[in-house]
Swiss-Prot record:
Its EC number is 2.5.1.6. Its main location: cytoplasm. L-methionine binds at E56, Q99, D240, K271. It comes from the Bacteria. Binds 2 divalent ions per subunit. Coiled coil: none annotated. It catalyses: L-methionine + ATP + H2O = S-adenosyl-L-methionine + phosphate + diphosphate. K(+) binds at E43. This is S-adenosylmethionine synthase. Gene3D superfamilies: 3.30.300.10. CDD domains: S-AdoMet_synt.
Length: 384
């Protein structure tokens, strides 16, 4: 069968952009813990020796931004000046202001069910059946590689590893869409000065790549690129500045689905960039899990200050078992996609976001938008 290739990448929790995402979501969680109705838009910038936390917040809560920031950086593993970034000595600037009352006017309502969207925008949710978590394989295994890198770094299996790392996996697909195998694997990891290139390659292959990637998809044709530049000592915020919201494809579907452009981290659930993207994933996953399609991409859009979505559309890439018009009707009947409705449906007004900020927001069963609790109702209503 003819084959085509598809590639996705991921980055570790120590990547500068992911440091920023985790700080933003740690601040959000701390505020939501005290004030579930808070309005939060928290942005973070990190560079050598400095973290700047800014944005707009309206809340009755008080949180210690400096302590939250230092704790987050420490948990990631930047704890010594030898790494170029130290949780205990970096400067922290707090430039958070209040949310515009013009936005509040459009969002808040006497009847919370009529809460308007916090902004206009379009969001996508996607699912397919090529993995047991209904996610594309390239992004799933890219995440697993850098997650494994973090584990063997923290448990000292490979004590010379440092926090910054990137992965990339290229899958080969048959013409019918089934997986033929893995064509290429890239893993670049920051390391200490004292490890040789040979030991690094062996350690990464034996302790990271082989335990993660299924042997059935590997062959003698599979290509491996482990630290292909030969040296990756300078990394983290010293190597590159980091910014919240700059890894939106890593956070979602690795490029296999479209993206509306809005980032997630640092945003409370009134921001449909985040909450509606989670709800769209919930819808798409339940449609695929119910057997109504093998692949499903749902688009939803909003106008600022308006509760009802301005559009809902579905693309199943020719894999639907029922008419797409029926799928849209099922979505409208079984899922409340108004901002208040989806926040209630998925119980989003609580501190659950920091753990989303590294290794992907989707395909992880601990999150409420990954539940498949609508499967039976969808099948029954579709007549299956």
């Amino acid at each position: 069968m003819a084959k085509h290739l598809f590639t996705s990448e991921s980055v570790s929790e120590g990547h500068p952009d992911k440091i920023a995402d985790q700080i933003s979501d740690a601040v959000l969680d701390a505020i939501l813990e005290q004030d579930p109705k808070a309005r939060v838009a928290c942005e973070t910038y990190v560079k050598t020796g400095m973290v700047m936390v800014g944005g707009e917040v309206t809340t009755s809560a008080w949180v210690d931004i400096e302590e939250i920031t230092r704790n987050t950086v420490r948990e990631i593993g930047y704890t010594h000046s030898d790494m170029g970034f130290d949780a205990d000595s970096c400067a922290i600037l707090n430039v958070i202001g209040k949310q515009s009352p013009d936005i509040n006017q459009g969002v808040d309502r006497a009847d919370p069910k009529e809460q308007g969207a916090g902004d206009q925008g379009l969001m996508f949710g996607y699912a397919n059946n090529e993995t047991d978590v209904f996610m594309p394989a390239p992004i799933t295994y890219s995440h697993m590689l850098v997650k494994r890198q973090s584990e063997v770094r923290k448990d000292k299996t490979l004590p010379w590893l440092r926090p910054d790392a990137k992965s990339q996996v290229t899958f080969a697909y048959n013409s019918d869409g089934s997986i033929a195998g893995i064509d290429a694997v890239v893993l670049s990891t920051q390391h200490s000065e004292d490890v040789t290139q040979a030991d690094l390659i062996e350690g990464v292959m034996e302790s990271i790549i082989k335990p993660v990637l299924p042997a059935k998809w590997l062959s003698k044709e599979t290509k491996y690129f482990i630290n292909p530049t030969g040296r990756f000592v300078i990394g983290g915020p010293v190597g590159d500045c980091g910014l919240t919201g700059r890894k939106i494809i890593v956070d979602t579907y690795g490029g296999m689905a479209r993206h509306g452009g809005g980032a997630f981290s640092g945003k409370d659930p009134s921001k449909v960039d985040r909450s509606a993207a989670y709800a769209a994933r919930y819808v798409a996953k339940n449609i695929v899990a119910a057997g109504l399609a093998d692949r499903c991409e749902l688009q939803v859009s909003y106008a600022i200050g308006v509760a009802e979505p301005t559009s809902i559309s579905i693309e199943t890439f020719g894999t639907a078992k029922v008419a797409e018009e029926l799928l849209i009707d099922l979505v409208r009947r079984h899922f409340d996609l108004r901002p208040y409705g989806l926040t209630e449906m998925l119980n989003l007004a609580r501190p659950i976001y920091k753990s989303t900020a590294a290794y992907g927001h989707f395909g992880r069963e601990e999150f409420p938008w990954e539940a498949t609790d609508k499967v039976e109702a969808l099948r029954a209503d579709a007549g299956l």
